[in-house]
Amino acid sequence: IGMDDALEPYAIVIAPVLYMVKGDYDEKIRSYTRNGGIFVTTFFSGIVQENDLVTLGGYPGKLRDIMGIWVEEIDALPNGEENEFTYEGEKYPAKLLCDIIHTEGAKPLSEYEKDFYAGSPAVTVNSFGKGKAYYIGTASSEAFYQKLLTEICEDAGVAPVLKTPEMVE
């Protein structure tokens, strides 16, 4: 989906690492979500505006009200180091970057297990108008993304056209 394309035809819009939010793209996301869309983004989103200048007022910048969170700090993990979080009773790795999240209306779905930000949300969902906005504050495993995105798709009534066996893409 391009920045100029309509979001409304899609039940779910996933925009991982939406580092740059150009112009009024936040308004497009805001309207889409308010009117019942499901928006998913991740760590390192809303960091800069269209001229690559840092967004003032905290992250995820112009998406802050939609996501219902603000990011106080980003912990960059050295290569080979991991934190972890528990989601629905299963532990998953938190890798690369870990956003230290404070909720502003969003509901935490999981929390970090280690380091000085243990207990801080790792994944959140915010009800926004008729829609929902999910924020994934870290890089994780394929198993985690599979679990979360399957649940989001089921919630939105989105199903695959074909059922494929495991290990087939």
What would you call each of these model-derived segments?
Residues 8, 16-169:
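A conserved amphipathic helix/loop scaffold
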Residues 11:
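Conserved acidic residues
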Residues 1-6:
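A short, well-structured beta->alpha microelement
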